[in-house]
Amino acid sequence: NITLTQEEIDLLAKIVWLESQGEPTEGQEAVVEVVFNRMASEKYPDTLYDVLSQGNPTQFCSWKNRERANPTEKEYTSIHEVLNGNTHILRNDTLYFSTEPLTPRLDQKIGGHSFCY
């Protein structure tokens, strides 16, 4: 179970907007799930900030541009849908997404992203 402060939700909304603007809602929700899967994984830090800002190479290369983000209600809705358990799209061990599969273990392709475990 993941609980976020409003400040963390605002930060996540910026990253979701930067990483997946123009993607379908399901694609944005899947990006949120990757963040939460990483927080739950022993392979990654357990805080939102640490997952999003993790060093090079970083999954979230948009981190450096976060202050320029302009998230909309769509990003906030996607976050709350995942936080509240209303949607569950990916496997719990899906930890990566990219425009091309990063590993041969493809979970799903949603919009322009491949989600891998």
Predicted segments with their positions:
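Bacterial extracytoplasmic/cell-wall-associated proteins, especially those involved in peptidoglycan
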Residues: 1-117
